[in-house]
Amino acid sequence: MSVMGSGLFFFVVGPSGSGKDTLIEGAKAALGPTGRYVFARRAITRPADAGGEAHEALSVDQFDAVLAQGGFLIHWEAHGLKYGLRATLLDDMAAGRHVIANGSRAMVAALAERVPHLVVVEITAPEAVLAERLKGRGREGAENIAARLERKVPPFPESVTVIQVPNDSTPRAGIEKFVAALVAQTARLRLVRMAIETGRRNVAFLARGNTVVAAPDYLGPGRVDLIGEGRSIRAEVALVGDALLPSDAVGLSSEAFGALGLPEGAELVLTRTPVPESRAALRRKIQGATLDEGAYAQVVGDIVEGRYPDSEVAGFLVAADRSLSDDEVLALAKVRAKFASRITWDEPMVVDKHSMGGIPGSRITMIVVPIVAAHGLAIPKTSSRAITSAAGTADAMETLARVDLDSAEVRRTVERARGCIAWNGRLSHSALDDVMNAITRPLGLDSTRWSVASILSKKLAAGSTHVVIDLPFGARARVKGAGEAHEMARLFEQVGAGLGLTVEAIPTDGSAPIGRGIGPALEVRDVLWVLEDHSEAPPDLKEKALFFASRILAWDPAVGPDRARARAEELLASGAARAALERIVEAQGRWSEPVRPARLTHTVTAQNDGQVSDIDGFAVAGIARLAGAPLDKGAGIDLKARVGDVVRAGDPLFVIHASTAADLEAAAGAALAFDGYGIMMDGKAFRRINPER
């Protein structure tokens, strides 16, 4: 709308109590330093120390003298005082600066004849809010306030551009809206797609000589909002040479352009992202202070809104990694739950099971859920995909059926089958998770206390009432020792109680893989063997699944702790659990053909006689990943020797499965360096386990 050399004149009007002065002062602080806005001082026949707005104090004689010399652009009288705006404001407009002036609605028509590019900004608020503000001033009684609010105002001339800014909330919110309205009229830019990829970061590019905005002013740690056609995106700013972008354009990186979803040439408004109100709280946490729920709500909200650069978020997360009190973990869990999609159930009890993971092959969820569902309790289980392991529960379940369910499909599946095993990426995953994961994973941050808040917030959002948590511990597990596991169990149960959840957290042995298969299809083979009472069913997998299923069934008053184990065994032995898995698979969307273990194989054998004393599950899982798991769901490792088994040189330790010769060769080559097995003979250890572990 505006170009350099032709500024706009913003005439701010509104009833008494609308807060014009506050908004103008706030805008002055935000926009004044740019040098592109002039905030007019009204000349008023009122002493300088009379209070109210900062004005040019003139006597009546002085005012009349300026008027006689043509020094006022416009002038008017109100409440026994004379008001005027200096004619020099026209010079500012001619120089391309935008004028913001506090004015009277009655003078709009006269001003429209004197200035080009007039924009009237009408500040509004409900009568109740106006009355409360006027009462708070203490200048007028109730009768005068009522009379002031009943005054009728003339309509604006049809030829004048009028924008309304509601100021019915906090001063900060009102100032943000006011500034955004001003900038929206002055900073309109054409959208250009830049052939630049910036990864997760949204980047907006401005030519250094941009003629619509002062581009260098937008450099720094702050962000900008780009708004147009009902869509918006938040981005950091980078400058480019004038030859790379038109002077009236804003360029977006490929990722930002796609996220905004508007075509090239669309008109965008550029505004500064408001400074986070929570910055003081964030800095206190970085310095080691304890924050309450309200402070965390502000900090987390501003992080999700993209108001902090990654460096400050990283500082906050490092501080949280070092020190979170029990009360802070509870506060964070409550706050995080608000950023996840909530699911409510018409059920007296909704149960769930979670594992801290890290133990290869421990696919007990696919046995526990069918047992519990066969009993009749609702168990809407959502699980993750593998990040660094050879398979996650979602990867394994996906060999049989769809897992990318939305909340409606989860509800429908549970109604039909009493349970589900779905991927959490479309359900409990939130915008906060995206931000946190992008920063914590490269930095290697893995706070168990932060994890407690995250996990329980998702259970709360999922509508769970009762949750059992598996805490495997061991030298190579995520939780290293029994003491740490028991402390984590205490925290889970305490925070769960604070959220209104019934939580039982149980430390378990995580020193070795569970089951035989490592990789999606091979792990599902083990699951089906257990559910079908196959002679090859891994006993450790069956026992752990029965243990956790019985802990869940014990919550049912009709079963109780004394009968829970027998009930779980009955449901497994009778085939009811196997039938329940079939119902779940059918409800989620069965594949026409399940994924089978890959056909190309390579057997890794023992080099010495002896007894298997140790299996490095992470080393073995690493070989499985080289074979193609988890993306290739048929790839993986089939363990032939378990801890305690006696082997002779040449006996198979495990079999590698792969779908391509190249993957098989890569995995077999890694196994030559270290196969992950420790074998003892006559007290002497023969180890081919990754020495870095």
Curated annotation (Swiss-Prot):
Positions that bind ATP: G14, P15, S16, G17, S18, G19, K20, D21
Any Pfam family: PYNP_C
Record keyword Transferase present: yes
SUPFAM superfamilies: Nucleoside phosphorylase/phosphoribosyltransferase catalytic domain, Nucleoside phosphorylase/phosphoribosyltransferase N-terminal domain, P-loop containing nucleoside triphosphate hydrolases, Pyrimidine nucleoside phosphorylase C-terminal domain
InterPro entries registered for this protein in UniProt: GK/Ca_channel_bsu, Glycosyl_Trfase_fam3, Glycosyl_Trfase_fam3_N_dom, Glycosyl_Trfase_fam3_N_dom_sf, Nuc_phospho_transferase, P-loop_NTPase, PhnN, PYNP-like_C_sf
Gene Ontology CC: one annotated term: cytosol
Enzyme Commission number, as recorded: 2.7.4.23, 2.4.2.4
Protein name (database record): Bifunctional ribose 1,5-bisphosphokinase-thymidine phosphorylase
Species of origin: Azorhizobium caulinodans (strain ATCC 43989 / DSM 5975 / JCM 20966 / LMG 6465 / NBRC 14845 / NCIMB 13405 / ORS 571)
